Each structure stands twice: as structure tokens, then as C-alpha cells.
Amino acid sequence: DLHMWKTYADQWSLHHKMDHENNIHTPELYAIWAQKAVFIDDAIKANPFKTDYFFWCDIGAFRDEHINPIICASFPTIHNLPKDKIAICSVTQLEGNDNTIIDEIHGNFQHTNRIVGGLWGGGIIGCLKWRQAFEDCLRLYFEKERFAGKDQSVMLSTYLANPTLANVYKPPNNYDWFYFQQLHSNLDIVAELDKSYIC
């Protein structure tokens, strides 16, 4: 009964044919990936803990059995989460033509990963703005027949269309998919914005 499946099931089936990795992905998986901001929206509406901040974390982010105990005890903290936008992690820097607008869409990231889609969050205001902007961008992807199966591609286009929606943080070592575990814990880490994403 997921919103992203009920609303866009036919689109996901079409986009499965566009996916160069369709042997390991399914239309249903695309819908789950796209549903993350809706899950956050639902959590905000319920808000059982009366919190001002929300954080999405894919369950696969904690698959390392040797994870630092400080992370396990404190993740996620809010000290690096903005109130009026979300925090996103880069895994590679933006390149010169990444912000090229084609068919009203910023960038084309079907064959490259620049940001992490599985760990992000922020204040209520930021998360709600993000949820709407993400779905607007997703609909544009569908309208322009741009592959939308990978949420981080749509996320990056969403951000590039409106950089005020997020802060993009840079891990000290590029291509660290799990850096936000460290940054949003009680480890002594200084947050650094990825300057290549400052538009």
C-alpha cells in the first residue's frame, strides 16, 4: 500500500526496461527506494517521540559487525542536522557538466553515483520541503522518460534544481557510503561541506 507504488506502478514497470542493472533490481524495489521521503513524512505526522528532527537510515547501513560501539550507542545525533533543510552525503565530487539541464532536469546520473541515498535527514521543515521537491522531480523524470529507478539520481537532480534544500557533506575519504554513521554520532568529527556542491 505504498504511495510510490500505488501512484506510479506502471511507470516503475516501464523504467525497469531502461535499467542497465535490471537483472538485480525490480520495479517494486524502485518504489521502495522512492518511498523514503514519504516514510519520513509519515513519521513526522505520527511523531511519537515529539522530536523536531528525522533521519532516514537504510537497514543495510549497519551490516558491519565491527562497527564502532560509540556509533551504535549514539547514532543518530542531531548536531550536524540542519533545521530548515536536510543533510546529504557525497561519495564523489560534482563534475563540470553534472549540473547541465537537459529536458528541464539537472544532470544525468543513471550510470554514476555522486551522493548517498540511504542516510539523510534534517529538521521537520527541511524534510517536508524535501519530500515535496523530490516527488516533483520524480514526476518530471517520468514525464521526460528519464530513468528514475535509483533514488540517489533523482535526489541529486532535486538538490541541483534547488540547492537551498540540503547541505551536502564531504567524507574525509571519498566514496565512503557510511560516513554519516560517524558524522551523526558522538565521535569527534568535524563536519565539512563538499564545496563542489555549493552552487
Predicted regions and their residues:
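Extended hydrophobic/aromatic segments used for targeting, binding, or gating
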Residues: 71-111, 129
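Short amphipathic alpha-helical segments, especially helix-boundary/capping motifs
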Residues: 13-18, 103-105, 128-132
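A short acidic, often aromatic-flanked loop/helix-cap motif at beta-alpha or helix-coil junctions
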Residues: 1-7, 95-96, 175-179
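Active-site-proximal specificity loops/subdomain of glycosyltransferases
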Residues: 1-48
